């Protein structure tokens, strides 16, 4: 169903598995989001359908996101799980700079040019109830901008797309092997970093730390 309806950028597929469960009751399929929030350092960008509509330099991106989220008010419905849309995405490790003042001015090398935070505003989604074998089609609208008829038309369109036949065409396999990947840090440097972190923990300088390396490969 995901491949049929949402196999595109700024969509998602989530399961509601909790704890040690092997099977989750709900599956969530987020259809393509029109609005996307991206944060680079202290710059917040809001895109709508790929077009930049807002751009701000802020002191605290986390506070800005919280204020943005607070403008939405969604009623709780008994037949739906607690999650039925909203902000979906990721917060990168680099956001520690927003929380720990001592790290605020550290200059980092951005080799990948990816957002520190990326959040989709998920208005349209499917909730699959694996227990009752039902699919809930959800769309959120702003009553000041949209009408009930507009939302109903969108729901009917999604339902029609669900009923359409779909033939999956497998993607060609990438010609990349494990040995093709090259570390930007190197094994020896990585091992030395792990040993340094162990000493810092024993000395009480840090409680935990995360070391990582970028792996690169050229697709053939």
Report residues per predicted region.
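Extended alpha-helical targeting/anchoring segments
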Residues: 1-216
């Amino acid at each position: 169903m995901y491949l049929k309806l949402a196999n595109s950028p700024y969509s998602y597929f989530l399961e509601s598995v909790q704890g040690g469960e092997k099977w989750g009751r709900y599956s969530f399929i987020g259809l393509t989001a029109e609005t996307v929030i991206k944060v680079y350092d202290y710059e917040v960008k809001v895109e709508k359908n790929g077009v930049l509509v807002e751009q701000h330099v802020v002191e605290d991106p986390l506070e800005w996101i919280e204020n943005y989220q607070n403008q939405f008010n969604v009623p709780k419905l008994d037949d739906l799980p607690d999650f039925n849309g909203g902000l979906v995405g990721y917060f990168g490790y680099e956001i520690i700079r927003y929380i720990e003042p001592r790290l605020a001015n550290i200059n980092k090398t951005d080799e990948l040019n990816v957002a520190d935070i990326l959040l989709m505003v998920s208005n349209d989604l499917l909730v699959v109830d694996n227990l009752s074998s039902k699919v809930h089609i959800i769309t959120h609208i702003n009553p000041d901008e949209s009408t009930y008829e507009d939302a109903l038309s969108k729901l009917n369109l999604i339902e029609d797309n669900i009923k359409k036949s779909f033939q999956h065409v497998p993607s060609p396999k990438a010609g990349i092997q494990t040995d093709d990947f090259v570390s930007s840090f190197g094994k020896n440097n990585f091992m030395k970093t792990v040993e340094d972190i162990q000493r810092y923990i024993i000395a009480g300088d840090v409680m935990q730390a995360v070391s990582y390396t970028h792996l690169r490969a050229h697709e053939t």
